[in-house]
Regions:
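Bacterial N-terminal signal peptides
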Residues: 7-18
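Metallocarboxypeptidase
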Residues: 48-49, 60, 80, 92, ...
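Boundary at the C-terminal end of the N-terminal hydrophobic targeting segment
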Residues: 20-22
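Intrinsically disordered, low-complexity Pro/Gly/Ser/Thr-rich segments with frequent PxxP/GP/PP motifs
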Residues: 490-520
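Short amphipathic, basic-aromatic surface patches that mediate peripheral association
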Residues: 459-473
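Active-site/substrate-binding loop(s) of hydrolase catalytic cores
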Residues: 73-76, 88-92, 96-292
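Short, aromatic- and glycine-rich surface loops/edge beta-strands on solvent-exposed regions
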Residues: 521-530
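Edge beta-strands of extracellular beta-sandwich domains
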Residues: 533-542
């Protein structure tokens, strides 16, 4: 009786302590590191963890490999978070994916079938600002950089003028300003349109002072380089935060080098403020025909559309965001320069709140207006009411500090993250099931007489995705399918090539091949590539 009592007691204690210590907030760098190390310890046969770089602030850029068997020659997907360090949700989503995929990979049914390369956060210097005493949206790493090119570094950072630990906005009453109060919600401001007889009444800028006296505010804060502007495709040279040159940063160079050396990756999924899964890339003849292409190739459009269709089936699309080109961005690099299928999503968007009789639901600053409606409905307080302050740079003007909190519009309450992660894990699971997969089908062995044997078969791509992008076949960076026939030394291949390459097989496509062989003994046939897997066949001719 006492034994049963203690069993029940300890069971209840375990339950309540588990509830007490359940994950309730976004994880910072150290908590993420601990979680990754725990995964490696829990699944030593399927998970390996390595640091590919050290950031300027001394943080490791972690790379988690999940899979078993021949890791280098099994089709793989890369999952990347944190290329924009202000996108906190994406980092947590990538980490949650790693945790679920590691558990799935340890099962016998998944053994040796697929590999995942997860980079949860490639810009930890920037994302740590979310967890700092002073919170503001930061996309740049910790590299000492003269962002305003005045010969000084970090001399004009943000200033917390109302001492609330947040950097929001300042509005300054000024007849030369170009901003007016929003007609539907005077907490927001919109740009005045002189053609509609609107006259500006406010200046609007981020919270802070002109610390260096150059007439600009907060133009040279701590850091750095925005890694999502630092990749090689359409690098925005000389733009704020883009870096001195493409892949100038330790983090971006390490990621690009590792991916270029990892030939078995067929697709890349990244979490960024962009979304080409709800708004898929479209083929444009003129863009694809340029010497330096600026649009996807025609042969790749169908894949982007079909994967988008899958995403829309799995992930609810209420008020889903869209895509706009980010020069120097990681998702763009992953297709145009790495030549893999590149999918990116922000993972969450504010649901549309319909307010009866509202004039400007799709008008200026409608996203912020919709966010305020939604946050009020959900009981989420992420707006600082405007409060008048004394500002040394505007001694004779009315200056107020307030606005939507940093990160609020892209970082949902943590209570929503599990459900968001679950639908995206479901999507990734279904996407990985579409991977290219090679097999030999319709094998025929015929006696051709005179000690000759004909072997005929089809090499079939059982997967839904092609064995490579069309762009990959053009750049010749994605490895083609290598076909090789070998036989005993006493045998001779009379017709049919002993070794050749196939550029690409579409999903469900087959290619017939045939050999005429003289003599008896063993023959072996292999066909495949690291990103599509390998098919093998052996036969003994008697």
């Amino acid at each position: 009786m006492n034994y049963r009592f203690f069993v029940i007691l300890f069971g209840l204690m375990g339950f309540f302590f588990g509830q007490l210590f359940a994950q309730e907030t976004y994880r910072n760098y150290q908590e993420m590191t601990n979680a990754l190390q725990e995964l490696e310890n829990e699944f030593p046969n399927t998970v390996s963890l390595q640091s590919i770089a050290t950031s300027p602030n001394g943080h490791n850029v972690w790379h988690l490999t999940i899979g078993t068997g021949d890791i280098e020659n099994t089709p793989a997907m890369a999952i990347v978070g944190g290329s924009d360090g202000a996108h906190i949700l994406g980092i947590e989503m990538a980490l949650k994916m790693a945790e679920t995929l590691a558990e799935q990979a340890s099962s016998e049914t998944m053994s040796g079938q697929h590999v995942f390369h997860v980079f949860p956060n490639i810009n930890p210097d920037a994302s740590e600002q979310y967890f700092s005493q002073l919170r503001y949206e930061r996309s740049v790493n910790g590299k000492n950089t003269d962002l305003d090119r005045d010969g000084m570094i970090g001399e004009d950072p943000y200033d917390d003028l109302n001492s609330d630990g947040l950097i929001t906005m300042m509005r300054i009453e000024d007849p030369t300003g170009s901003w007016i109060l929003h007609p539907d919600d005077n907490r927001l401001l919109i740009e005045a349109n002189p053609l509609k007889s609107q006259r500006g009444a406010y200046l609007l800028m981020t919270e802070g002072q002109d610390n260096d006296g150059d007439g600009h505010f907060n133009e040279d804060p701590d850091g750095g380089v925005n890694l999502n502007k630092n990749f090689t495709y359409q690098h925005p040279s000389f733009e704020y935060g883009s870096g001195e040159f493409p892949v100038s940063e330790t983090e971006t160079r390490a990621l690009a080098d590792l991916l270029f050396d990892t030939f078995n990756i067929y697709a890349v999924l990244s979490f960024t403020p962009n979304n080409n899964l709800s708004d898929p890339w479209q083929y444009s003849r003129s863009d694809a025909a340029k010497r330096v292409i600026t649009g996807i190739l025609e042969g790749d459009e169908g894949v982007f559309q079909s994967v988008s269709d899958l995403y829309k089936e799995v992930v609810p699309q209420d008020n889903a965001s869209g895509y706009s080109l980010q020069p120097g961005g990681f998702p763009e690099w992953a297709y145009f320069h790495y030549a893999r299928y590149s999918f990116t999503t922000d993972g969450w968007w504010v649901p549309k709140v319909k307010t009866e009789g509202e004039e400007n639901s799709n008008g200026p600053d409608s996203d912020k207006l919709n966010y305020l409606r939604w946050s009020e409905r959900e009981g989420i307080n992420t707006f600082t009411d405007w409060e008048q302050i004394d500002h040394p740079d505007f001694p004779d003007k009315v200056v107020e500090v307030g606005g939507v909190h940093p990160f609020a519009m892209t970082t949902p309450p943590y209570s929503m993250v599990d459900s968001l992660a679950n639908v995206h894990i479901d999507f990734v699971t279904q996407l990985s099931a579409m991977r290219p997969e090679l097999a030999f089908e319709n094998i025929q062995i015929e006696d051709a007489g005179r000690n000759l044997t004909r072997i005929t078969l089809d090499l079939h791509n059982k997967g839904s995705l092609p064995t490579s992008t069309e762009l990959g076949t053009r750049t010749q960076w994605v490895r083609p399918i290598n076909v090789e026939m070998t036989s005993d030394s006493s045998m001779q291949i009379v017709s049919g090539r002993p070794a050749f390459q196939i550029d690409r097989l579409m999903g469900g496509e087959s290619q017939e091949m045939s050999w005429l062989i003289s003599g008896s003994g063993s023959v072996s046939l292999s066909a495949g590539s690291s990103s599509a897997g390998f098919a093998t066949y052996e036969h003994t001719i008697r």
